[in-house]
UniProtKB/Swiss-Prot annotation:
Pfam families: CwfJ_C_1 (PF04677), CwfJ_C_2 (PF04676). Transmembrane segments: none annotated. SUPFAM superfamilies: CCCH zinc finger (SSF90229), HIT-like (SSF54197). Signal peptide: none annotated. SMART domains: ZnF_C3H1. This is Zinc finger CCCH domain-containing protein 64. InterPro entries: Cwf19-like (IPR040194), Cwf19-like_C_dom-1 (IPR006768), Cwf19-like_C_dom-2 (IPR006767), HIT-like_sf (IPR036265), Znf_CCCH (IPR000571), Znf_CCCH_sf (IPR036855). PANTHER family: CWF19, CELL CYCLE CONTROL PROTEIN (PTHR12072), CWF19-LIKE PROTEIN 1 (PTHR12072:SF4). Residues 243-263, 272-291 are annotated as: Disordered. One of its GO terms (molecular function) is DNA binding.
Length: 596
């Protein structure tokens, strides 16, 4: 039986009115499995704050599992900040952070299964002055990556409407005043073209609009756009809509490719000049969906300075074909396919710093129309961990050896959290020569002894992935009294996320690393942990597996009862404070440092 879902526009904190309507509809046409809200979820003003807080604080009950994306409005920062720090909300969660019983915040962007339906979402708005309510470029990039995964998307949730959605639609059906492109979001247009959902649900416009189905480029199924009004709006516009779609995963190709009556062409690529001029002030709005940045001077061919087609670089194809005004650069596409940072490819630089998880050097000899540079020069300039890089944060370094150096990470989990980093640009610490491995072993033993002198044990972990261009072995001290809990807590966390850790016990840490070197498959990836008692936990990543990059840190944050520090971005401090921590650790480590 197909799941039954209720969709709602901006609640604006009017939860009494919303849930009263939900219960009424449920009696006549229910039951329903879930309620999904798009648009502003929190109140516009303090006047109905008490009503809203009754639900959040448990004095009133949310009657149905409810998911929301509009994380802005009065008290949103306070409530969502508290929600983020809850222990049960730590870790890699795309299916919603629990605010209270039956109420879930869809943070950032993600994709999850809801009663068999594949649901993708982009939370927040394009711009906001607050921490909450604004989506980031990382959220957009993550959603693009998820869109490339196999399997279709049934529901795509955004707060704002996609720019151009009314193009090619029946004029008589378009609500008055909503064709103004300033009230819609071109980034959402780009994303919906890549996600290709069967249903796209959005709020924020204050009106109800069910557009005719439209055809998708490079896909056989159609997309239906549904815009929903605000709860309690004065014009009696529809704010609650029931839907019972059959999950894509259970549909036959014939069912998926069925074309309902009044199906239109794809709305985001109008080429007809007359129609275009009636619906938009100029052609630049449409073009803006295909490129993001001017190509830097060193990337330009001739004097034209063509812009790269963002759609082609991301997916390898462009619906415009020869009609596209932007550059279809096959080399740029190849670099994207190999995991190179899009900003580096298109802008010529990445400004995200250590937050960026993509590669920061090109993966073959091609220069993508750049001036040729040596491989080492390329690496040292773009890599955040190469000592010769201008981006390296030298004030964090606490020891330098022949083949490795030790440094504090940005936003350390605890004060003595250390990274062991190879000086040579290596993708992981499992591809070392015997001499280099020997120095790594000496550093590990030195850190073990240093921590032991303080009543702690050392936990080492590393994520070996194609997206990690320069290796860093993380080392975190844990109280010796809690070390015995490590195997179980790691295994339980892995099971919760849907994978298993292989457990092997060794009498000598050297034997453990030899085992890991044999297990490592360069074509795949590996996550491993070296525990104080000689136990090695490991998980080989399957092809296309999305592994939580912060898994090791999140597990240890839970063990140490500091879940609010699971995200390193919550732990940022000033450069002066970082330098002091580094100096303090140097003094502690001095007698144990193998390179002193």
């Amino acid at each position: 039986m197909a799941p039954r879902i209720l969709l709602c526009g901006d609640p604006l904190g009017r939860l009494n009115q919303l849930f009263k309507r939900v219960q009424s509809v449920s009696k006549s046409a229910g039951p329903f499995d879930a309620l999904i809200c798009v648009g502003q979820f929190f109140p516009d003003s303090p006047e109905i704050l008490d009503e809203f807080l009754d639900y959040v604080e448990g004095r009133a009950q949310v009657p149905i599992p409810t998911y929301f994306t509009g994380d802005y409005g009065v008290v949103a920062p306070k409530i969502l900040s508290t929600t983020s720090k809850k222990a049960e909300n730590q870790g890699f969660k795309m299916d919603g952070l629990e605010v209270c019983h039956n109420l879930f915040w869809l943070r950032g962007s993600g994709k999850f299964s809801l009663h068999g339906l594949s649901v993708a979402y982009l939370s927040g708005r394009q711009s906001s002055e607050s921490q909450f309510g604004k989506y980031s470029q990382d959220d957009v990039d993550a959603l693009r990556a998820l869109a490339e995964e196999p399997g279709g998307v049934d529901l795509f949730l955004t707060n704002e409407w996609p720019a151009g959605v009314t193009n090619r639609a029946a004029v008589s059906d378009i609500p008055v005043g909503i064709s103004d492109s300033s009230c819609s979001d071109s980034t959402v247009s780009e994303l919906v073209m890549e996600v290709k959902p069967r249903y796209h649900i959005a709020g924020s416009m204050g009106v109800f609009y069910a557009r005719e189905p439209y055809l998708n480029a490079e896909s056989t199924h159609v997309t239906r756009f549904i815009g929903l009004a605000q709860v309690g709006n004065k014009n009696k516009q529809k704010f609650l809509h029931a839907l019972s779609p059959t999950p894509t995963s259970t549909m036959s190709p014939a069912e998926l490719s069925a074309k309902p009556p009044k199906t239109t062409l794809w709305p985001y690529n109008l080429q007809d000049g007359a129609a275009e001029s009636k619906k938009r002030p100029n052609d630049s709005d449409s073009d803006s969906q295909y490129w993001r940045y001017d190509v830097p001077k060193r990337q330009k061919s001739g004097s034209q300075g063509e812009k790269l087609c963002f759609k082609f670089v991301c997916s390898g194809s462009c619906p415009r074909g020869e009609d596209c005004h932007f550059q279809h650069n096959a080399e740029a596409r190849e670099q994207c396919r190999r995991g190179v940072c899009l900003d580096l490819i298109i802008k010529g630089k990445c400004e995200k710093g250590p937050e960026c998880s993509y590669k920061h050097e090109f993966q073959d000899e091609s220069s993508i129309q750049r001036k040729p540079r040596s491989e080492n020069a390329n690496r040292s300039k773009e890599c955040w961990f190469c000592l010769s890089s201008p981006s390296v944060e030298s004030h964090l370094i606490v020891s330098v050896g022949e083949s490795f150096y030790c440094a504090l990470p940005k936003g350390s989990l605890v004060e003595d959290h250390i990274l062991i980093i190879p000086i040579e640009h290596l993708p992981n610490t499992l591809v070392l020569s015997p001499e280099v491995e020997s120095e790594l072993s000496r550093y590990q033993n030195g850190l073990r002894n240093c921590y032991k002198s303080q009543g702690n044990d050392a936990v080492f972990f590393e994520l070996v992935s194609k997206r990690v261009s320069h290796a860093n072995l993380q080392v975190v001290p844990v109280p010796s009294s809690r070390a015995r809990l490590l195997p179980n807590i790691f295994s339980l966390a892995a099971e919760k996320l849907g994978f298993k850790l292989v457990t092997k016990k060794f009498n000598d840490s050297t034997d453990g690393r030899k085992y890991l070197q044999k297990e490592y498959n360069a074509a795949l990836g590996l996550f491993y942990v070296e525990l104080p008692d000689g136990t090695v936990l490991s998980h080989t990543l399957e092809e296309n597996e999305v592994f939580p990059a912060q898994f090791g840190r999140e597990v240890l944050a839970g063990l140490l009862k500091i879940p609010d520090r699971a995200d390193w971005r919550n732990c940022k401090i000033s450069q002066e404070e970082e330098a002091k921590l580094a100096e303090d650790f140097k003094k502690q480590f001095q007698e144990f440092d193998p390179c002193q």
